[in-house]
């Protein structure tokens, strides 16, 4: 089984991924795939370079470029595990790539929704090199994500979790969701 976790930047995807990992489920991060490709191209890991490589990959390999690069990582993990989580799928083309590459696997999409103002504050506090420091940067990044088609993936989710609450409550919601998914599938 493949569990795709999607949501806008700063929505809380990593909490879900970490909860699966605590239960022994390995993961592949689509963002890490892009960052690895950025480094392979000899570029410094800045938000500008990562964004450019993300766009360039899609120009070179199609809208499902990052998924194509991630398929082998997922395949390797599925050889040893019954369940693999993919973090950060951004388009239905990418979902389709995984469906085509793994026709015998059940694929479940989990989406996280968090209000924009909460995501902005979390991203500023997170401090990763590609996180926005101004509202304008934040909005620009959101528009890029939406242009990739992330909204369509969110709309097709099998499970939706809302992260509009204190951290402890969200963690409880995540634990319940992960337990439910693993029990039902």
From Swiss-Prot:
Lineage, please? Answer: Archaea, Methanobacteriati, Methanobacteriota, Thermococci, Thermococcales
Keyword annotations: ATP-binding, Nucleotide-binding
Q: Does the keyword ATP-binding apply?
A: yes
Protein name in UniProt: UPF0200 protein TON_1344
Domain of life the protein comes from: Archaea
Matching entries from SUPFAM superfamilies are given as: P-loop containing nucleoside triphosphate hydrolases
**What's a single GO MF annotation on this record?**
ATP binding
Family affiliation: Belongs to the UPF0200 family.
Q: Is-annotated flag, keyword Nucleotide-binding? A: yes
Q: Which PANTHER family does the entry mention?
A: DEPHOSPHO-COA KINASE (PTHR41930:SF1), UPF0200 PROTEIN MJ1399 (PTHR41930)
Stored InterPro entries: NTP_hydrolase-rel, P-loop_NTPase
Q: Where on this chain does ATP bind?
A: 7-14
Give the organism, scientific name: Thermococcus onnurineus (strain NA1)
Q: Which HAMAP family match?
A: UPF0200 (MF_01111)
């Amino acid at each position: 089984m493949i569990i795709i976790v999607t949501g806008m930047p700063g929505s809380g995807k990593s909490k879900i991924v970490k909860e699966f990992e605590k239960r022994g489920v390995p993961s592949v991060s689509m963002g890490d795939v892009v960052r690895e490709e950025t480094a392979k191209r000899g570029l410094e890991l800045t938000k500008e370079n990562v964004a450019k490589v993300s766009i360039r990959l899609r120009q070179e390999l199609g809208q499902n470029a990052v998924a194509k690069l991630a398929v082998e990582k997922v395949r390797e993990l599925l050889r040893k595990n019954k369940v693999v989580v993919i973090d950060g799928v951004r388009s239905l083309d990418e979902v389709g790539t995984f469906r085509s590459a793994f026709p015998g696997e059940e694929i479940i999409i989990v989406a996280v929704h968090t209000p924009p103002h909460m995501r902005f504050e979390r991203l500023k506090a997170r401090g990763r090199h590609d996180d926005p420091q101004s509202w304008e940067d934040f909005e620009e990044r959101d528009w890029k994500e939406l242009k990739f088609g992330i909204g369509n993936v969110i709309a097709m989710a099998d499970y939706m979790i809302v992260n509009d609450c204190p951290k402890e409550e969200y963690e409880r919601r995540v634990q319940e969701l992960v337990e439910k998914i693993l029990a039902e599938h």
